[in-house]
Amino acid sequence: MIPNEEIVLQPGQTNSFSISLVNQGSLQAINVIGEIITSSNLLTINNSNDSWGTINAGSQENSGNGFNVTASSDVVSGSQLIASLLIEDSNGYNRTENIVFRFGTVQVYDPLGPDNYGYYIYDSNDINYNLHPEYDWIEISQIGTNLNLANSGNGNWNGNGPLAIVDLPFNFKFYGIDYNQITICTNGWIAFDDVYSEAFRNYPIPGAGGPSPMIAAFWDDLETGNNGDVFYYSDNNYAIIQWDNMRTHFSNSSETFQIILNNDSNLPYGDNSIKIQYEDFNNTSVGDFNDYPPEHGSYSTIGIENHFANDGLQYSKL
């Protein structure tokens, strides 16, 4: 016997429903009962049991509309949850099947994701979700360390160059792996552990172009110019990387932004959370350099990518 439908719920909705079972066997199923089980906190099961009575061989029957569940208000529209349906009858038949709960329909003000690992990206417009971020700029140019990085764009640099490797004051779990060191690049990204490529041409993520694993806050060909600097600050609560008054190589637009790595573990599988903030955001590089193929990439790339470069979320790359 197998269920042949999915249950659709809106975030925060409580609903009673029946489940249709098809008896694909050759024997009559007598006194069929079922129980829904899940360990997810996204779904509260108010009444987990229902019955189908007798289902003849080759027939289909609905349960008595006794199942009752409540979807969490934090569940992301468009996502789904697979729960277990335990089925038994008085003849000794027992089987566990999957039952699919689908939550809402994706709208503009819903987070991006999930990727295959389970990450979502929430932005400040996702106000219907408790996890939506609020802008709270933490200025570190006066309290942090100036990494004294230098980059004149288009792969040219001098002095200390475009990369710095720094130790984190805590282990940061990213895609299930603990890291205690990051590589910071002037071109608007960080990678975990040692990376020796400045990757000034931005590409879609996930993908083979660029470092991995990475967090791209504003991956583009960026220059330090006369006033651009990259700062680093950390304490027991977070590590902050701030790109301050950087300039795009293509259009000389000003960019100031920061990545905050939080010392927490409130994401799926105990991973740490990430916050990206923009004080000055001008996504103006169109990627059309008349004299120098190939293109540098249209606009900036924003998102995350795992260590195999085969999973991630791309928030922006027009």
Describe the predicted segments one by one.
Residues 11-27:
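Short beta-strand elements of extracellular/lumenal beta-sandwich folds
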Residues 1-12:
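Low-complexity, acidic Ser/Thr/Pro/Gly-rich terminal tails and inter-domain linkers that flank the onset
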Residues 32, 64-106:
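Terminal connector regions
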Residues 14-16, 60-66, 96-98, 238-240, ...:
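Intrinsic-disorder/low-complexity, polar/charged segments enriched in Ser/Thr/Lys/Arg/Asp/Glu/Gln
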Residues 22-43, 48:
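Short acidic, flexible loop segments centered on an aromatic residue
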Residues 71-73, 102-318:
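Extracytoplasmic Ser/Thr/Pro-rich, glycosylation-prone low-complexity segments
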Residues 44-75:
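Intrinsically disordered, low-complexity Pro/Gly/Ser/Thr-rich segments with frequent PxxP/GP/PP motifs
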